[in-house]
A protein has these predicted regions:
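Long, terminal "pre-/pro-" and other extracytoplasmic accessory regions
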Residues: 1-396
Length: 396
């Protein structure tokens, strides 16, 4: 219950943060529903924690009031009432308080040192809209932490669209494997059947480090390969090194037959950087068509790649013409978001559908967000919060 409570408080903090930059409409209502449900889950979890470990009275009161406030805002939205300046101040106060509690829970819950002082200020709770709300622990919807950037792990695909048509033999696959790994000592490692059938190989270098690689039988593109980094610290390198690594990855992608790729997000650990690249067409980012590339921080060599998302998704697309112009789309973004960049992107909605959206990146206070506005309807499609760590960026 301790771990689940920490997770739910963190997820509630994330949802409150997104709510500050959400416009009206579907995303706003979904976030309010998330917050209410997470509030109910936290109340249920606290009932399972011995009172000696946590002052449940104060924390319970705080969490219940967050849920109450979310339901009150939902009722306002359903009545077509606009959010007021008082609402904005209330949301910011709740977010800040939730963030403090979430940090302290993760740091101190295990030893029973909980920061109840952070939740006792009645100014955080006073609301003319608070209503009695029936709590529910039937949680069927949570904000999901998405590593490597938005849409990096999209839903399981039904068929591989980007393989090509021509079948290749093992020796042709071996030549490709040797070219892409820089070794001529590839040994047979069997073959893989399934949606992406492949010829598999391994190699061992002079230092005893192994490399495994799979080449698609149909089309001959790399499916994945993985070697080992020379070593190094688990931290993000300086900007010049990151740029050098990105260029090395782009050069390797071109050699592997992946053209017009755009670097999105990166993580750095175990002496390597893992950089996400999305395909582009007509300057539109295709978030479904992703290739991850591992680059050794010390040697700047590409030591791994995973092209499965790309092979499942990449196909010729007819891009729709936006019905909403950039200015109209920007007007749909909350005034609380200080916009820093704008792109066009094709984002996954379901396993089989994508939507052309304007991608707005910006800040609300100290926090960074990405907001997607549908380029055809002007509806708010998705919101992500960017989480900066010593190893790179995550989104949630």
């Amino acid at each position: 219950a301790f771990t689940e409570l920490c997770d739910d408080m963190s997820n509630m903090q994330t949802a409150l943060g997104k709510l500050r930059v959400a416009g009206s409409g579907g995303q706003y209502m979904l976030l309010l529903d998330d917050i209410w449900r997470l509030s109910g889950s936290c109340v249920s979890l606290m009932s399972q924690i011995p009172s000696s470990h946590i002052d449940t009275a104060e924390l319970n009161s705080f969490v219940v009031r967050i849920g109450d406030y979310a339901r009150a805002l939902s009722k306002k939205a359903l009545n077509d009432e606009e959010r007021t300046a008082e609402d904005e101040e209330q949301l910011t106060a709740l977010y800040d308080s939730c963030a403090r509690i979430s940090r302290e829970l993760n740091d101190r819950l295990s030893i029973g040192d909980v920061p109840t002082a952070a939740v006792t200020n009645e100014g955080y709770y006073e609301s003319a809209y608070a209503q009695d709300v029936k709590q529910s622990d039937d949680i069927d919807k949570f904000p999901t932490l998405i590593y490597d950037g938005p849409f990096s792990e999209s839903s399981e695909k039904r068929e591989a669209k980007g393989l090509g048509t021509d079948e290749i033999d093992r020796e042709t696959a071996r030549a490709t494997a040797e070219k892409l790994t820089g070794t001529d000592r590839m040994e047979d490692a069997g073959e893989t059947e399934g949606t992406i059938a492949s010829w598999d190989f391994t190699a061992t270098d002079e230092q005893g480090r192994e490399t495994g690689i799979s080449i698609a039988k149909r089309g001959g593109k790399i499916v994945w390969f993985m070697g080992s980094a020379a070593g190094g610290e688990n931290q993000m390198p300086d900007e010049a090194t990151r740029e050098r690594m990105k260029q090395a990855a782009l050069e390797w992608l071109g050699k592997a037959g992946f053209d017009d790729m755009h670097a999105t997000y990166a993580q750095y650990y175990s002496g390597a950087g893992v950089i996400n690249f999305a395909a582009t067409k007509d300057d539109i980012i295709l978030y479904n068509d992703l290739v991850k590339v591992w680059v050794d921080i010390e040697t700047n060599e590409v030591i791994g790649a995973d092209a499965r998302n790309y092979l499942f998704s990449h196909t010729e697309r007819e891009m729709p013409t936006p019905s909403v112009n950039p200015g109209e789309a920007e007007a749909k973004v909350s005034v609380n978001l200080e916009i820093e960049s704008r792109e066009l992107a094709l984002i996954p909605i379901t396993v089989e559908t994508e939507r052309l959206c304007y991608e707005f990146k910006g800040r609300c206070g100290e926090d960074e967000y990405i907001v997607y506005i549908d380029a055809q309807t002007g509806a708010e499609q998705q919101i992500f919060v960017i989480i900066n760590t010593e190893n790179g960026q995550l989104t949630a």
